[in-house]
């Protein structure tokens, strides 16, 4: 197998599930079933609000249409995952993705640290810049500043989680010297993984993150992106650090061979899910994943 970057976090492929349209009273049960099936992680989506009128183009559909109806139910991901944490023991808890520039970093740091402590160090902060200008307008934040805000927020989060005192005098994050306790179990090593497909997004993941979340790739396109990220990691002097590649796969596509193909292409994990995957498909999907994950090639 061709190794496309110096360090791989795992010696075998991992499989997670992305539960995008599941209600809270169903989420815990599905997460428990996923844990029993051998899945390593459960991921939930996040938006603060859903605008009534959306002119922004959704970047992961050719027609730019929003991925879900405007009346979709939205829940706080940290509260949802807290419920999952209380009823599971090993499955990791991720956001896919949390719109990082919309929040004060103190609020984000506290929510993430609390869940990481509650879960025994199982949180993955999947983060993105956001794609809806209307969502930022509703929150009173300039959409054009989201990348610059992210660049300031990430170092502050890591400092709050690891240092005795944190301060910041950035353009967007101004913070006098403060104490932040308790720290999450992994401190500054709590993983922050970035979504996004643009060149800027890939560089951001390599520069600031511990991983990348890819959307709707093939093994061939994954191989190309992983090679590019590997070159960026080397450019930023991070070539010897753990960096986790996760790629989204539709529930209808997942098979043992698909998992193997993505792993050989450089992905550490496939995340099975879809923005519109109906509730009725998940029992069958989880049963299928249980079979796939018991195959000799994945054990």
List the model feature ranges, each with a label.
Residues 1-299:
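Active-site-adjacent structural elements that line small-molecule/cofactor binding pockets in enzymes
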């Amino acid at each position: 197998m061709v190794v496309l970057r110096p360090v791989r976090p795992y010696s075998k492929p991992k499989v997670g599930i992305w539960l995008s349209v599941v209600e809270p009273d169903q989420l815990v049960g599905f997460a428990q079933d996923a844990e029993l099936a051998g899945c390593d992680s459960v991921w939930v989506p996040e938006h603060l609000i859903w605008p009534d009128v959306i002119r922004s183009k959704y970047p992961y559909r050719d027609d730019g249409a929003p991925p879900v109806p405007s009346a979709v139910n939205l829940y706080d991901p940290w509260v949802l995952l807290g419920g999952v944490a209380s009823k599971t023991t090993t499955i990791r808890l991720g956001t896919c993705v949390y719109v990082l520039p919309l929040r004060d970093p103190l609020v984000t740091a506290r929510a993430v640290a609390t869940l990481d402590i509650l879960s025994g160090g199982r949180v993955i902060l999947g983060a993105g810049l956001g794609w809806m200008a209307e969502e930022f307008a509703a929150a009173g934040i300039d959409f054009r500043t989201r990348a610059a805000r992210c660049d300031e927020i990430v170092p502050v989060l890591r400092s709050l989680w690891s240092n005795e005192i944190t301060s910041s005098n950035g353009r967007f994050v101004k913070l006098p010297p403060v104490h932040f306790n308790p720290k999450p179990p992994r401190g500054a090593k709590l993983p922050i993984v970035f979504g996004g497909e643009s060149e800027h997004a890939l560089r951001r993941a390599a520069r600031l993150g511990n991983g990348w979340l890819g959307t709707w790739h093939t093994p061939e396109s994954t191989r190309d992106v992983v090679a590019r990220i590997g070159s960026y990691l080397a450019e930023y002097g991070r070539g010897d650090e753990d960096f986790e590649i996760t790629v989204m796969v539709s529930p209808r596509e997942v098979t043992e061979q698909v998992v193997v193909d993505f792993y050989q292409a450089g992905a550490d994990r496939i995340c099975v899910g879809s923005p519109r995957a109906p509730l009725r498909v998940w029992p069958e999907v989880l049963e299928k994943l249980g079979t796939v994950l018991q195959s000799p090639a994945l054990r």
